[in-house]
Amino acid sequence: MRAFTQHQGTVAPMDRSNVDTDMIIPKQFLKSIKRTGFGPNLFDELRYLDEGKPDQDCSNRPLNPDFVLNQDRYKNASVLLARTNFGCGSSREHAPWALDDFGFRVIIAPSFADIFYNNCFKNGLLPIVLDEKVVDRLFRETEENEGYQLTVDLEAKTVTTPGGESFSFEVDDFRRHCLLNGLDDIGVTLEDADTIRAYEESRRKTAPWLFNTGN
């Protein structure tokens, strides 16, 4: 998993509440568990004018010109600005996979669905909760200023505007540690590899029958 310390990126505004995981990545794309390749189908039903199919070449599909990610000013966005209850619905982990594969590193919203919020951290995405009034302001500034960027500092737990104003956010210390060091669940376990090996050696001496592999 990629480590996250600080990120500066263009902001794309997703101006709707209750964006669910089926909207983020529709159900027909959930057969794969590779974690990659979902970016072209992110927000598929909003992004394209036709119906998406698994393993389809998306390069020639008709685009919805009104959808935010199809607008030139937002095509390279890596910070998604969203509304309340982002990521609600089913618990599919494909949703953060698709956001990450598209190129997003940060999602900012007034609130997130709990399971989606947890899944983001497990997949290298940083979900940030800011006060709704602050989010409203960021929406206005994003729409008024082409190329609007935010700087997110996970060490300092701040979001900073181009004008230099910073907003603080909260994040659990353990999740912060994992993101700063690029640790997924396996990586966290491997941090204690020496302790685990020492325990296994101790158990071989105190309970050797547990390790008897003979026929």
UniProtKB/Swiss-Prot annotation:
InterPro entries assigned: 3-IsopropMal_deHydase_ssu (IPR004431), Aconitase/3IPM_dehydase_swvl (IPR015928), AconitaseA/IPMdHydase_ssu_swvl (IPR000573), IPMI_Swivel (IPR033940), LeuD (IPR050075)
One Pfam family of this chain: Aconitase_C
Protein keywords: Amino-acid biosynthesis, Branched-chain amino acid biosynthesis, Leucine biosynthesis, Lyase
EC number: 4.2.1.33
SUPFAM superfamilies the UniProt entry points to: LeuD/IlvD-like
GO terms of biological process kind: L-leucine biosynthetic process
One annotated Gene Ontology cellular component of this protein: 3-isopropylmalate dehydratase complex
Catalyzed reactions: (2R,3S)-3-isopropylmalate = (2S)-2-isopropylmalate
Pathway involvement of the protein, from the record: Amino-acid biosynthesis; L-leucine biosynthesis; L-leucine from 3-methyl-2-oxobutanoate: step 2/4
Entry's Gene Ontology molecular function annotations: 3-isopropylmalate dehydratase activity
Oligomeric form and interacting partners: Heterodimer of LeuC and LeuD.
Described purpose of this protein according to its UniProt entry: Catalyzes the isomerization between 2-isopropylmalate and 3-isopropylmalate, via the formation of 2-isopropylmaleate.
HAMAP family: LeuD_type1
Protein family: Belongs to the LeuD family. LeuD type 1 subfamily.
NCBIfam families: leuD (TIGR00171), PRK01641.1 (NF002458)
Protein name: 3-isopropylmalate dehydratase small subunit
Organism from which the protein derives: Marinobacter nauticus (strain ATCC 700491 / DSM 11845 / VT8) (Marinobacter aquaeolei)
Phylogenetic placement of the source organism: Bacteria, Pseudomonadati, Pseudomonadota, Gammaproteobacteria, Pseudomonadales
